[in-house]
Amino acid sequence: MMNKILSNVVMHKDYSKDIVRVLRSSKSDEVIRKKLSKYHENDIADAIKLLDKDTRIRLYKILGVDWTAEIFSYLEDTPEYIEEFMTELSVDEAADVLEKMDADDAVDILDNVSEEERQALISHMEKDAKDDVCLIYSYDDDEIGNKMTTNFICINNKLTIKEAMKELVAQAEENDNVNTIYVVDDNNIYYGAIDLKDLIVARDYQKLEDIISTSYPYVYAHEKMSECIEDLKDYSEDSIPVLNKDKEIIGAITSSDIIEAVDEE
């Protein structure tokens, strides 16, 4: 997520034409894939817009599902291309790509296809990914829940330092927003948060409780973004947990989400 923020603000060379030349070369798929690995996904996303349909379809096959998903997550700023690119994939292929994306990024893509195609794609997604997407869609456009990501780390407050680190590593395989670790009690109620650095430097003999910030801010999913945007701007945290009415963590609102909301205001 942070890479996405940086790619929007840091000035850099336009590599799209270089990438196009690589893709239009007569090199093997393996060689092209190796050359593409030297470029940032945002640059490849820019290059895709310059390709003809046949070359794009070849590119999707070269990239594979995971890499295509990373690249498609950078298309949200150019929605006019999204529907065309998605229809170049079969429904099953497109659904596979969406499953590999963060749910909020998948929603950004789905928002830019027809209602019929949206429902078809969602119906072909695996249950966990589908549930995350449907959760976000269950909130109105102006509610926090509609802007949240389901990419977060959550652990129990009764773990030892060693157990907490082990749980972090396990969850990080699927969730890469690791800078802030959310904490719940035995009833799955939000308890607080831990800064990643504090967990890394903690000694095994310390109690997890000693590094939990129980006053860490949170918001409710049904809150209006417009009504709490000023409060959110005051926080410098990478992310803030989003709770349901039972104070269970269902998502997170990230710094990039807040920046986008401020820009819209």
Language model: regions and residue ranges:
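Hydrophobic packing positions in regular secondary-structure scaffolds
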Residues: M1-E265
